[in-house]
Amino acid sequence: MKDDNCIFCKLANGDIPTNSIYEDDDFKVILDASPATKGHALILPKQHYANIFEIDDETLAKAAKLAKKIMTHEKDVLGCEGYNLVQNNGEVAGQTVFH
């Protein structure tokens, strides 16, 4: 399911051009438009999930494996020495896009 009003759905599904670094049937990984650090990337599921409580366990596990794959690639290519893996859930936790 996609949400036509969700900016991340539009980015993940190609409705808006992106700096994509990886894509498969379930996810698109893009470089952040305003990166906080070198290699700042967003792992976007192609299906709409407002928060971690809506995503099924299988897709969540795939996202974790993909995060490791992307971080390993960035370590090798960009020389990144450390990583932040962030997933904000809820407005009080800093979530601004509910995807």
Q: Language-model features: where?
A:
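HIT superfamily nucleotide-processing domains
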Residues: M1-H99
